[in-house]
């Protein structure tokens, strides 16, 4: 006989008759604001107690949400999922693919916002080309050209104080989109050019799409009742992206391989999905890593020392160069630990399941709050401290710190505690886990490594403003303008 407790007794905010818990988000006061879900998660974490779970039941148009605040529990759920794991739906995107533009997508709805057999069938066609390590490694030289062009553009958009413009996050969107075009479509989209007509249309679509997503996917679904202005902007952007993917298919890139076997439509649908999930996420990761390094002179100097040793200034980088940059990779991991681009991943469980000692019914949506776990002391000692060394292997640490560990006592203490604690494999999952993890993970990592290597090899980057705050859009992005200050390293003495 099961000793699990009844689901009814799982802690959580009490739903009201008829309207359930939806009223909390409808009113929109802390801690129940869709753009401040980080605050909501910390509130629920306090409710859960040590290693427990919390439910938010009876949300209008949504299944019950269950939040297990335990890396061990997260591991159990992930490891027992079936061959076709179900993620939370993106209702508006699903509507676009499966209803509004069904004549185009038909039986090939893609990977995003799709579940079950259609998702599994499409994934089987495209996964080999995306997951194979050699595919992303082969793309490094072309991505390096994009990174070089973007860093050159950064120099051009600096003001008289050598400060980047307030819309620098949009510039990072352009870089990310140009990068996806390079490796997925095998072409340059022109996003980094000032007067390219296609590029202007693309950027307009980027603005329209990313401003529409949080309103449509996180707020009350008014678009189901009538075509709101935001809904129209969203659909126009998706149509434009779809046309772009068909128009820009070439005989190069990952999608060209797919087209040879499965046809241009499958290749274009894959390209569309890659654009939808590979632009704002990668741009946000780049922004956060720049911010943490700009605020941490010690880590920035360590990174620059590694770059000076392993990457000649004018060299076109390849995958072997990236292999020699463990500290750069640790800097990115540490940034994504503190500020993951997605606060949590989810699964819609397909059978009754015991979670944190409670019987959870089939159909519930389990949300894995990685943002909370990766910022807790029990998994990461001194979690608010930016310490890339915690991700390094023992043999890499002494060189990265320029000296024996005892030289920097604070960092050494954090590293030793982390070594004793270990890093739980399910405490920080910025790319997800399992068959539904980010399918473009290797490409995104290469994009980030190349861009950040170029920036910090060339510049000292500083931040002269206060602490950045973040919002959920649904990507976790900074609110304030990213006005970094850049100085050429060869024109300014190193500290």
PLM regions with names:
Residues 23-52, 243, 247, 316-356, ...:
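Conserved cytochrome P450 K-helix E-x-x-R motif and the immediately C-terminal K′/meander segment
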Residues 299, 366, 428, 441-477:
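Cytochrome P450 heme-binding "Cys pocket" and the immediately downstream C-terminal segment
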Residues 1-103, 117-121, 144-149, 346, ...:
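N-terminal membrane-proximal hinge/A-helix region immediately C-terminal to the signal-anchor transmembrane segment
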Residues 255, 475-495:
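C-terminal helix/juxtamembrane-tail motif
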Residues 83, 368-418:
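Conserved cytochrome P450 K-helix/beta-meander segment immediately N-terminal to the heme-binding cysteine loop
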Residues 88-99, 137-286, 302, 473:
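Cytochrome P450 heme-thiolate monooxygenase catalytic core
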Residues 394-448:
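Cytochrome P450 heme-thiolate "Cys pocket" and heme-binding signature region
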Residues 281-293, 451:
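Short, small-residue alpha-helix embedded
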């Amino acid at each position: 006989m099961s000793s699990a407790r009844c689901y009814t007794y799982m802690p959580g905010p009490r739903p009201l008759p008829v309207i359930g818990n939806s009223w909390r988000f409808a009113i929109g006061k802390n801690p129940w604001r869709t753009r401040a879900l980080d605050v909501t998660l910390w509130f629920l974490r306090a409710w859960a107690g040590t290693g427990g779970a919390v439910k938010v039941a009876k949300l209008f148009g949504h299944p019950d949400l269950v939040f297990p605040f335990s890396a061990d529990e997260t591991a159990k759920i992930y490891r027992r999922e079936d061959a076709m794991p179900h993620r939370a739906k993106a209702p508006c995107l699903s509507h676009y693919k499966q209803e509004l533009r069904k004549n185009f997508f038909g039986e090939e709805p893609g990977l995003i916002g799709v579940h079950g057999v259609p998702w599994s069938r499409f994934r089987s066609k495209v996964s080999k080309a995306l997951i194979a390590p050699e595919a992303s490694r082969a793309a490094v030289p072309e991505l390096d050209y994009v990174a070089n062009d973007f860093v050159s553009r950064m120099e051009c958009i600096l003001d008289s104080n050598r400060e980047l413009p307030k819309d620098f996050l949009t510039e990072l969107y352009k870089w990310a989109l140009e990068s996806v075009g390079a490796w997925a479509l095998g072409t340059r989209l022109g996003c980094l050019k000032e007067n390219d007509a296609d590029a202007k249309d693309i950027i307009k679509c980027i603005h329209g799409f990313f401003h529409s997503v949080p309103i449509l996917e996180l707020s009350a679904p008014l678009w189901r009742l009538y075509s709101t202005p935001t809904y129209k902007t969203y659909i126009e952007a998706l149509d434009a992206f779809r046309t772009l993917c068909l128009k820009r298919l070439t005989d190069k890139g990952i999608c060209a391989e797919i087209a040879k076997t499965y046809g241009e439509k499958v290749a274009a649908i894959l390209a569309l999905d890659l654009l939808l999930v590979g632009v704002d996420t990668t741009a946000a990761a780049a922004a956060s890593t720049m911010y943490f390094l700009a605020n941490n002179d010690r880590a920035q100097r360590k990174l620059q020392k590694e770059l000076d040793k392993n990457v000649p200034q004018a060299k076109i980088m390849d995958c072997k160069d990236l292999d020699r940059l463990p500290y750069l990779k640790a800097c990115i991991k540490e940034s994504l630990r503190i500020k993951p681009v997605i606060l949590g991943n989810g699964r819609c469980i397909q059978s009754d399941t015991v979670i944190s000692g409670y019987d959870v019914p089939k159909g519930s949506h389990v949300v894995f709050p990685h943002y909370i776990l990766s910022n807790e002391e029990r998994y990461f000692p001194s979690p608010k401290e930016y310490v890339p060394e915690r991700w390094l292997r023992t043999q890499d640490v002494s060189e990265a710190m320029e000296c024996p560990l005892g030289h920097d006592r604070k960092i050494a203490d954090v590293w030793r505690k982390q070594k004793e604690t270990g890093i739980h494999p399910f405490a920080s999952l910025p790319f997800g886990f399992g068959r539904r993890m980010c399918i473009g993970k290797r490409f995104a990592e290469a994009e980030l490594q190349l861009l950040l290597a170029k920036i910090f090899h060339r510049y000292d980057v500083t931040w002269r403003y206060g602490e950045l705050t973040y919002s959920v859009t649904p990507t976790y992005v900074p609110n304030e303008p990213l006005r970094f200050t850049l100085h050429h390293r060869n024109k300014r003495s190193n500290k």
